[in-house]
């Protein structure tokens, strides 16, 4: 099934072969309230930023997320789907599959997010909410986004939002599987780079 007259026809996917997790900040709100994000590098270092926006504008959600949030991002390669805890720890032994809940830095990030929830930086209805925090609105200050080199850093998110979005990576770039679509049956074949 994947050949026509003995030849394989495929359309490569022009996409990122690597990506990182980033905090995406609402640029107009950073400027309006004079909030500095230059020291943000992980979940723990977000606290002064979240506190500042909560004090300056209580109508803005400091850390936007809803019920689809799968937990803190980290340098993990998921061996199944994101909802399962089985990962390869890219900062640890990459020859083993482990439960992410046994990795101390992941547990610390969970504790940090819980602290933010209790402080009101994360929406109280996060577990049941379908609220989508539109990139183009001033309803949120920070959210998590996956960004790769083909996204040109801030520029793709800024173009989509039609406003400045400032990103701060908090994981390394890591390679991932891309798909090639072949004809005539549109089967998906996985390959890695």
Residue ranges, per PLM feature:
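Extracytoplasmic/secretory soluble proteins
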Residues: 1-193
């Amino acid at each position: 099934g994947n050949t026509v007259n003995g030849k394989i026809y495929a359309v490569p996917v022009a996409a990122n072969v690597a990506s990182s997790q980033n905090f995406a900040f609402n640029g107009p709100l950073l400027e309006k309230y004079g909030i500095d994000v230059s020291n943000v590098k992980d979940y723990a270092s977000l606290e002064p930023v979240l506190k500042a926006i909560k004090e300056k504008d209580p109508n803005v959600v400091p850390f936007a997320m809803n019920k689809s949030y799968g937990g803190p991002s980290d340098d993990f390669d998921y061996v199944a789907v994101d909802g399962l805890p089985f990962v390869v720890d890219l900062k640890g032994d990459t020859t083993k599959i482990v439960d992410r809940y046994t990795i101390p830095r992941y547990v610390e990030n969970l504790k940090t997010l819980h602290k933010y929830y209790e402080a009101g930086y994360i929406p109280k209805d996060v577990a049941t909410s379908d609220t989508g925090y539109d990139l183009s609105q001033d309803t949120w200050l920070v959210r998590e986004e996956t960004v790769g080199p083909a996204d040109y850093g801030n520029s793709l998110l800024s173009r989509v939002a039609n406003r400045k979005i400032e990103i701060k990576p908090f994981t390394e770039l890591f390679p991932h599987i891309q798909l090639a679509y072949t004809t005539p049956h549109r089967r998906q074949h996985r390959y890695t780079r």
